[in-house]
């Protein structure tokens, strides 16, 4: 997809809430990716990120180990950002479903 962000100073505006949320996700991914470079997480690093940063959306009893094992392409026990994004998408779906049930 590439980078589409404007490099022009006059185009620089305050980021929207969604843009800030995406930047926060990326920063958190990089903060937890210690072993083997900033572009991947080990299953252990992903587990730490999820348990520390998403304790209410993905509590420890939500089958986290199985979800991690089933994520994307787990080559050499390294998970790329896309796999993390899959997990975030799953968490977002559960919030949407929960809100829909509560709204009924």
Curated annotation (Swiss-Prot):
Annotated compartments: Cytoplasm
Chief place where the protein resides: cytoplasm
Any Pfam family hit: S_100
UniProt keyword Cytoplasm present: yes
Disulfide topology: none
Alphabetical keyword list: Apoptosis, Cytoplasm
Assembly and oligomerization: Homodimer. Interacts with AGER.
Top-level lineage group: Eukaryota
Keyword Protein biosynthesis in annotation: no
GO molecular function, one term: chemokine receptor binding
Protein's name in the database: Protein S100-A14
GO cellular component: extracellular space; perinuclear region of cytoplasm
One of the GO BP terms on file: toll-like receptor 4 signaling pathway
Annotated EF-hand domain residues: 27-61
Summary of the function given for this chain in its UniProt record: Modulates P53/TP53 protein levels, and thereby plays a role in the regulation of cell survival and apoptosis. Depending on the context, it can promote cell proliferation or apoptosis. Plays a role in the regulation of cell migration by modulating the levels of MMP2, a matrix protease that is under transcriptional control of P53/TP53. Does not bind calcium.
UniProt gene name: S100A14
């Amino acid at each position: 997809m590439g980078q589409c962000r404007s490099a022009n100073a006059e185009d620089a505006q305050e980021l929207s809430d969604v843009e800030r949320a995406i930047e926060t996700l990326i920063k958190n991914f990089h903060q937890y990716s210690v072993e083997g470079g900033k572009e991947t997480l080990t299953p252990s690093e992903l587990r730490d990120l999820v348990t520390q940063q998403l304790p209410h959306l993905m509590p420890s009893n939500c089958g986290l180990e199985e979800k991690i094992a089933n994520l994307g392409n787990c080559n050499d026990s390294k998970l790329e950002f896309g796999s993390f994004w899959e997990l975030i998408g799953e968490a977002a779906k559960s919030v949407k479903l929960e809100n829909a049930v509560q709204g009924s």
